[in-house]
Structure formats: structure tokens, C-alpha cells
């Protein structure tokens, strides 16, 4: 969604091998805006279709860390609060400026828009990751970071009449939980179903049910299906398996 063609200027590519670009894209000088840093003025060519026009204008603001909760052994929910309302669409993300990291990090939101200014992120620890090292090991409740957003076009379409299918794995849980919560709040599940599939490596990596269970219709119109690829040899896992 953030693909563009560089016409003139210089930039730094933060992730040269990002899977969002094909070899054809690279030959044509295309880049991913979320993985680039401008080194000066740029001229670019990008799609300007109506789907890329922000429904909510991104805004930079200061956010205070208000709470941390463990979801699994390596997945945590970080709750930030801003002075202004948290205005975003279910499924969108925001950029966090973390102290000492140098570059912003993009993290999906897990909650829904609210007037209390609460922004919830469900983030998985990345081994040797600079951003998650700060979040997991350095940042304390009460500390402030920069927050820029919202961004993203993969948000909940409330006008689609079909059932909703959410597929997530790892920290990809966050945007799907946001979409499920948004669908429930909008009353979309009164006449349709939501199927939520969560893939994990082992049983201890599974989560998501606790976030979905409070929603109206859970177990009836909301179906949660966890799947693991390494169930173990003890026979304790009784759920679905797959690769």
C-alpha cells in the first residue's frame, strides 16, 4: 500500500530485502515508504486513487505509556495515552518514535477509536530488535514517546455484506482484534458471522481468545480457531494443527 517510484532525490532504504517489493518493482526503482528515510527533498510517483486518501489525517503527538500486560511469553500489550482523542479506523497502525532507536517503528493498533486517547499495541519481542528491546526492557510506565498516525488502508469496511474472516499470527493479532472489536461495536455481527483464525508455532504462543471472548456473540457469531504447527509430543494440544 505504501509503494512508490523515486523520480529524483536521495533516500536511505531501511530494509533492502523487504518482501513487499518484487524484482520487477526493484528494477523500476520502486520503494516502500514505510521502509525508507528521506535524505533530502524527493520527487516521487505514487498511486493517488481514492482508497489512498486518508479518512483520518495523521497527526504527530506525544504519548505516555500507561500500562503493560503480558499476552504470551514474548507478546505484550502496551497501552499509551494521549491528551487528544484516539481517532483511527479498525485495522490501522501508528508510528512510534522510541528513545535511542533512531527510526520510527510501525505497530498495529489493537483497540478501537475512543475519546479517552487510548492507543493499544500488541507487540512481539524480536530477538536483537532495537525497537522491541526499548519497549520490553527499557521503557517504563509514565515514560513518553512520539506517536504519529493513524496510517494504513487495510481497515474494516463496514459496508460489505459478507461474513468477516480474520487471519492472524504472532503480533499480527493486533489489527485483527481491532477489526473484530470494530465489527462488534458497529453492530455488524447481528446478521453475519466473524471467523477468526490464529496461527502459532507452539501451544504457548497461542493467544487471542481472551481479547475476543468479551465481544457480544462470541462462540455463536464469532468463531475463534487457533492452529499450531508444532503441537508437541505430549498430546496436550487438542486443537487444530497445520503448517
Residue ranges and their predicted role:
Residues 163-179:
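A phosphate-binding catalytic loop at a beta-strand-loop-alpha-helix junction
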Residues 53-143, 162, 200-202, 227-231:
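Ferredoxin-reductase
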Residues 1-32, 36, 193-243:
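Reductase modules of NAD(P)H-dependent flavoproteins
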Residues 149-162:
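A short, basic/flexible loop-to-alpha-helix module at the beginning of a structural domain
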Residues 7-10, 47-49, 99, 150:
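Short, surface-exposed secondary-structure boundary micro-motifs
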Residues 177-187:
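Histidine-anchored nucleotide/phosphate-binding helix
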Residues 19-53, 61-69:
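Short Fe-S-cluster ligation motifs
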Amino acid at each position: 500500500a505504501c509503494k512508490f517510484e523515486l523520480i529524483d532525490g536521495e533516500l536511505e532504504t531501511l530494509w533492502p530485502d523487504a518482501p513487499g517489493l518484487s524484482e520487477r518493482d526493484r528494477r523500476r526503482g520502486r520503494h516502500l515508504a514505510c521502509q525508507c528515510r528521506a535524505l533530502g527533498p524527493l520527487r516521487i510517483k505514487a498511486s493517488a486513487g481514492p482508497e489512498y486518501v486518508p479518512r483520518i489525517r495523521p497527526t504527530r503527538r506525544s504519548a505516555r505509556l500507561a500500562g503493560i500486560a503480558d499476552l504470551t511469553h514474548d507478546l505484550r500489550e502496551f497501552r499509551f495515552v494521549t491528551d487528544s482523542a484516539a481517532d483511527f479506523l479498525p485495522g490501522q497502525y501508528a508510528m512510534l518514535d522510541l528513545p535511542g532507536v533512531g527510526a520510527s517503528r510501525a505497530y498495529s493498533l489493537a483497540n478501537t477509536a475512543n475519546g479517552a486517547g487510548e492507543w493499544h499495541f500488541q507487540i512481539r519481542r524480536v530477538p536483537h530488535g532495537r525497537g522491541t528491546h526499548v519497549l520490553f526492557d527499557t521503557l517504563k510506565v509514565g515514560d513518553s514517546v512520539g506517536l504519529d498516525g493513524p496510517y494504513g488502508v487495510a481497515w474494516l469496511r463496514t459496508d460489505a455484506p459478507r461474513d468477516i474472516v480474520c487471519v492472524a499470527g504472532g503480533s499480527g493479532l493486533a489489527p485483527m482484534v481491532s477489526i473484530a472489536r470494530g465489527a462488534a461495536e458497529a453492530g455488524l455481527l447481528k446478521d453475519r458471522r466473524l471467523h477468526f483464525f490464529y496461527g502459532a508455532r507452539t501451544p504457548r504462543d497461542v493467544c487471542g481468545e481472551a481479547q475476543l471472548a468479551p465481544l457480544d456473540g462470541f462462540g455463536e457469531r464469532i468463531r475463534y480457531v487457533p492452529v499450531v504447527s508444532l503441537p508437541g509430543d505430549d498430546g496436550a494440544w487438542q486443537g487444530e494443527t497445520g503448517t
